[in-house]
Amino acid sequence: MKSDGTFDAICNNNFGSGTPQAVKSAVLDKSKDQLIVATNAEFEPFEYMKGENYYGVDMEMAAYIAKKLGKELVIKNMNFDAVCLSVGQHKCDIAMAGLTISEDRKEYVNFSDPYYEASQRLIVKGTDTTFDACKSADDVNAILNSLTEDKKIGCQQGTTGNSFIEGSNDLGFPGLKAKAVAYKNGSLAVQDLINNGVDYVIIDAAPAERIAKAINEMS
């Protein structure tokens, strides 16, 4: 995929000047030769839906893989926490959902070589000045670590941001005193931030930028 330029083209479609390509899922049919992909289509620009079609980096890659294998593509959209488990239970063939490689997940699946290095982003209200003086990630972390138990931080359930707040020995996160409030997707977390349901939101950088841009354009 990398050697023939397909991966770069897919990245350009979703991160650059290209156009995201619609990916259709066939209906599951055990009589056919199908590639069944588990995902959680709540994570733009990696996997998301518009109407009945799937879009995003992982979904375009899934379509390419199915075509190379000569199989019909079936996409099963499920809760994020069930994605790896569904492969481990042989209900799906592969999982593609913006997954962070972790030892816990290796109990269920074998990972490919990593193809994207993600980072986390903190989303705050425009009127919040708590982090205005921060000049580095260490400055941000120092404030996050000083937050007390009464503070609430929104995140997408089961993601790296969730693990960062609650703590994870596997990923090397000591955790915060602030309470993690997990949502089905990052957009719901940010909406609750606007509605004063949480104080901050921590999610992956790519979806954070898309969500913040969309919210600001609506304001």
Regions found by a protein language model. Give the residues of each.
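Periplasmic-binding protein-like
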Residues: M1-G18, G161-F164
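Extracytoplasmic small-molecule ligand-binding "clamshell" domains
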Residues: D4, N13, V27-L99, A182-Y183
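A short, compositionally biased domain-edge/stem linker segment
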Residues: T19-L28
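Bilobed "Venus flytrap"/periplasmic-binding protein-like clamshell domains
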Residues: A41-E44, Y54-K67, E117-G186, A205-P207
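Acidic, polar ligand-binding/catalytic clefts
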Residues: A63, K67, E72-L144
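Alpha-to-beta junction loops
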Residues: G70-E72, G88-A97, D150-K152, N185, ...
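A ligand-binding cleft/hinge motif common to bilobed small-molecule-binding domains
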Residues: D81-L85, A97-Y108, S163-G167, L171, ...
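Short beta-strand->loop
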Residues: N110-E117, R121, K179-V181, A212-S219
